[in-house]
Amino acid sequence: LSDFLLSKYKVSNKNYREYSKLTNKRALPVGPFMKNHPSLLSDDYSANATWQQAKDYCQWLGKESGKKIDLPTEAQWEYAARSRGQYLPFATNNGELLPGENFPNQDELDSYTDGIGLPFYPLGKFPPNPLGLYDMGLSGSEWTNDWYAADYYSHSPVNDPQGPAQGTKKVLRGNVGGDRQYALTMFRQSDLPVPKISKDDDYEKYGVGPQYVFRCVVNK
């Protein structure tokens, strides 16, 4: 991979609210789930966004700073999560997932999420991975720039793979609860760029769930 710098933290609610004010964008819709669990809207939790909203934020940051900033490719994300491509099952300080040490235990998750116990918590609460990146693969699924195809890496370029040229779903990486496999550094997921939260698919009513989060990359 060509040189890149991945953000130390995911984009926070505070970051995104400031961006919305500076760009005169509407605030993100807040659905019933988030209203019932207002801790998730606190300044130091990850911002929840559609794929395009996440990409727009990163590219705006690039325009303002004069740098090439975007969503990371899936390959960049995994390389960083695995601390330069090492075999590390989890992107924690030691490659293991240890509740109460480098990931919240159940009591902590309850306190962070108004009693619901889902795996979302404030940014930077636990040790980073060896590259200094916090919460990689944890506390939500992170958008990447790539379209998803199950067989993409069987024929992808060796250098700087960018994902398929087109598709219907975008690649996500990270844990949203349930089986720990979702937090594995090599586990692939995908979803529609505007995720369907409910059967009537009303984004203005439901927004997006707390699992759709992101961080940005600076490309050299």
Locate the predicted segments by residue.
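A short glycine-rich, aromatic-capped structural motif
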Residues: L1-G31, T50, L138
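Conserved aromatic-histidine-acidic binding/catalytic patches
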Residues: D3-F4, K8, S42-S46, E204
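Residues within well-ordered beta-strands of beta-sheet-rich folds
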Residues: L5-S7, W60, T144, R215-V217
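Feature responds to low-complexity, polar/acidic, surface-exposed segments characteristic
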Residues: L28-S42
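Functional-site microenvironments in short loops/helix caps that host divalent-cation chemistry
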Residues: L40-Y45, W51-V194, P210
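Short, P/G- and charge-enriched loop/turn segments at secondary-structure junctions
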Residues: P130, V194-K205
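Short, structured beta-strand segments at or near domain termini in extracellular proteins/domains
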Residues: K205-K220
